Amino acid sequence: MSEFNFISRLHNRGLISHITNEDNLSKLIENKSISLYCGFDPTEESLHIGHLLPLIMLKRFQIAGHRPIILIGGATSLIGDPSFKEKERVFNSNYNVNIWTEKITKQISCFLDFNCGKNSAVLLNNNTWFKQINILSFLRDVGKYFSVNTMINRAAVKQRITRPDQGISFTEFSYNLLQAYDFFILNQQYQVDLQIGGADQWGNISSGMHLIHRKTKRVVYGLTVPLLIQSNGIKFGKTESGTVWLDSNKTSPYKFYQFWMNIEDANVYYFLKLFTFIKVSEINKLEKNKNINNQIINDKSLLAKHITQLVHGKEKLLAAERITKFLFLKNTTHIEESDLQQLKQDGIPFIEVSNVKDLQEALVLTSLAQSRTQAKNMIISNSISINTEKIRKNHIFHEKDKLFGKFTLLSRGKKQHSLLCW
């Protein structure tokens, strides 16, 4: 197999966890444009960064000339995928699923090109076909092709069945068949030859391939991207403050940008290969020079920049960079009023004030100091800044301290901040 073909390039970036019939799939996609799909169940009002790799994989295939199909699980989300879940999901209402579907559809739309000719992206909802099938038809036309013994022994289900405190309901157990039917319908109606997903979807993808082969004798393919786990064993994208969402109203572009700036050093160059479109040869050069002048910090910034722009766009990336420079590089030149409003929304402690006179009082009010005495000592020890400027003696506030006439940023060291809102 040529080292320059598409599948080899995906391997070179570490993007493939599982793949079926690799040689045949590689020949297929080198010789013609194929249709592939990935499903997303709207079980929340936003996707999170755990969904990024499959989305970016679809984008890579589209750039290579193939047609990506996004399948929104309007029906399957009413059941919930039990794969590797420790306990049964809480059912979502039709009302919530419909609202979440609209929101997630808008999020996904910015990743792919829906107007580029023959390989334009397609957006579908599996509720379209599931609302037309009855239970007896489904059991006769789909269920008869599956062995319960095989289904029980799939790793995604087995861990639930073997736990004494948790079983699995027939409802969740049937999810595997529903997703298999999705693949079958897409193969029949949209000529889909490949399903992609996260590594935890391998069992569901395999079931779809099995169903298609049993019913039609056709050969189709599956490919999964790796599941990313942090060194503490927690899934990538989970932080102490919660999930990192793609929706800017749930995780601001600034917080999103900072998440990537704070990843473990060991992951920087791997993630550049996974999440960006920078050439592997260029990434390897960056890694070779990572210890020169602390270059790895710049490389983290490069990663954060590429992914933030991909998810949130250029304008919100620039705002995230302005806030970062303001807080960490003491650069107030280009800060905008909306950036400070964003800081307030992002959870930086703030208090509404009107008649605070001096810095010591403000430090106590914001809990950056426990007493005026402690505040005085912190000021003397050069630990306190006003709008990123170090203060060495008690300070009486003036209008010039109020950015845009409204905000004063107090900082204790590099990481503790509080915003005075006048």
Swiss-Prot record:
It is an enzyme of class 6 (ligase). Pfam families: SYY_C-terminal (PF22421), tRNA-synt_1b (PF00579). It is found in: Cytoplasm. One of its GO terms (biological process) is tyrosyl-tRNA aminoacylation. L-tyrosine binds at Y37, Y175, Q179. Keywords: Aminoacyl-tRNA synthetase, ATP-binding, Cytoplasm, Ligase, Nucleotide-binding, Protein biosynthesis, RNA-binding. A motif ('KMSKS' region) lies at residues 235-239. CDD domains: TyrRS_core (cd00805). One of its GO terms (molecular function) is RNA binding. One of its GO terms (cellular component) is cytosol. PROSITE patterns: S4. It catalyses: tRNA(Tyr) + L-tyrosine + ATP = L-tyrosyl-tRNA(Tyr) + AMP + diphosphate + H(+). A motif ('HIGH' region) lies at residues 42-51. Transmembrane segments: none annotated. Residues 357-414 form the S4 RNA-binding domain. The keyword Acetylation does not apply. ATP binds at K238. Its EC number is 6.1.1.1. It comes from the Bacteria. Catalyzes the attachment of tyrosine to tRNA(Tyr) in a two-step reaction: tyrosine is first activated by ATP to form Tyr-AMP and then transferred to the acceptor end of tRNA(Tyr). Belongs to the class-I aminoacyl-tRNA synthetase family. TyrS type 1 subfamily. Homodimer. This is Tyrosine--tRNA ligase.
